[in-house]
Design a protein with these regions (language model features):
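Conserved catalytic core of Hanks-type protein kinase domains
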Residues: 83, 108, 153
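Structural signature of beta-strand start/N-cap positions in the alpha/beta core
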Residues: 17, 45, 104, 126-128
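Structural recognition of the conserved hydrophobic beta-strand(s) that form the central parallel beta-sheet
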Residues: 48, 90-91, 107, 127-134
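Conserved post-Walker A coupling segment in P-loop NTPases
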Residues: 7-72, 82-88, 93-98
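Conserved Walker
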Residues: 70-81, 94, 100, 109-127, ...
């Protein structure tokens, strides 16, 4: 594990998205947090979210919600993308994302902006994405279950 954390420091030097494969339990969380803490984004927010077991509505809400109407809610009305602005977003279990959510993430990452659903202007975003998967994403791409474009971006 110590060797992986040392390697994380190398990835921290880049601002590119990172994909962590094969780590189970909390190891991927520790690696992602080490990348963030050693990066130039260390003073920005670090947001982690686990996609396992979420249906499409929960995935969309967890990542892209912009409403401030529910301050009592788990996300305080704001999705992980907005919370991670100027910081790092770690998505554990990225293989569990639906294709629709994958395409929304891809569009957000490429445009560096998020279209609001409440008719407000576009929110500019500066988020570094770190994903983790126990499954080889290339296999899922071949099965039509994962976006090849998103795989190339991360």
């Amino acid at each position: 594990m110590q060797q992986l954390l040392e390697e994380a420091k190398i990835y921290a030097l880049s601002s590119s998205p990172v994909m962590i494969y094969g780590q189970a339990g909390i190891e991927d969380y520790l690696i992602a947090e080490a990348i963030h803490n050693n990066s130039d984004r260390r003073n920005g927010p670090y947001v982690s979210i686990n996609m396992r077991g979420m249906d499409i509505e929960k995935q969309m809400e967890a990542l892209f919600s912009r409403e401030d109407a529910d301050p009592e809610g788990a996300n305080g009305g704001r999705g992980a993308m907005l919370k991670a602005d100027r910081g790092t977003l770690f998505i554990k279990g990225i293989e569990h994302l639906t294709l629709r959510v994958q395409h929304q993430i891809l569009r957000t990452m490429l445009s560096r902006a998020m279209m609001r659903t409440d008719a407000q202007p576009i929110d500019a975003l500066d988020v570094r994405l770190i994903g983790s998967s126990k499954v080889n994403l290339q296999k899922l791409v071949k099965q039509g279950k994962f976006s090849e474009e998103l795989k190339l971006v991360i």
